[in-house]
Amino acid sequence: MPEICRFYGIVIYMFFNDHNPPHFKVGYGEFEANILIENGNILNGDLPISKLKLAAAWAEIHKEELLKMWNTKEFHKITPLS
């Protein structure tokens, strides 16, 4: 499970052979959630709303890059929010 980004205590991962729809995993303390790349909504899991908003904003900025990683399975680090 490659870590692709980390910011404000949020850790973002993507699995190689995960199920559709395209999503990424977010960890924050004891919270974990799968976030849809398309719209930044929670697929399943739970996050504090402030961290969900940050993860969704980050995903919107990097949507095309995230979708490319999902489709090619070529993972790399992505610039965090600052």
Model features per residue range: what roles?
Residues 1-22:
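Short, charged/polar N-terminal "headpieces" of proteins
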Residues 2-6, 48, 59:
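A generic short-segment signal for beta-strand/edge and adjacent turn/coil regions
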Residues 3, 30-32, 38, 60, ...:
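Glutamate identity and glutamate-enriched acidic tracts
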Residues 4, 41-44, 78-81:
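Generic preference for hydrophobic/aromatic residues in regular secondary structure cores
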Residues 5, 14-15, 35, 58, ...:
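Aromatic-enriched hydrophobic runs in primary sequence
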Residues 15-49:
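A short, structured beta-strand/loop element
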Residues 53-82:
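C-terminal structural segments of small proteins and small subunits
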